[in-house]
């Protein structure tokens, strides 16, 4: 994230999109690489990307807006307090890894959009290439002239309706203009 924030320093608009596993440990959110092998809770920080750090770095940039889109709570590997290790053993996690991600506040000039509410787990969409959230995001992004906030409002409505409000997207925004 350090390199990204340095490279994007002069950009007017910065967009980060992540689809994959996301977990919280002790109130901090982490995005897990696709090939990660985490055998114990204390390995999460060293083997993942710290979402809170990304938001802090983006918030420190003096100009431009930041849009962070996270489709990151599908099939949370640590929910249920037990995970299958690489050798087939069941590993227990002790209470610090609840399902879903912890709430975050978007830094000034930023919007953070989640595929589901804090603590929630997003549904898979096994019959399609993209998740349900990303499917609706792509559909509504194609609407010409639709302001960013309304794009995400439409995604919220579509996902909530299709899942019977089992999955409800969530945003935190401090965009000013």
Residue ranges with predicted function:
Residues 1-177:
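Cysteine endopeptidase catalytic domains of the caspase/legumain-like
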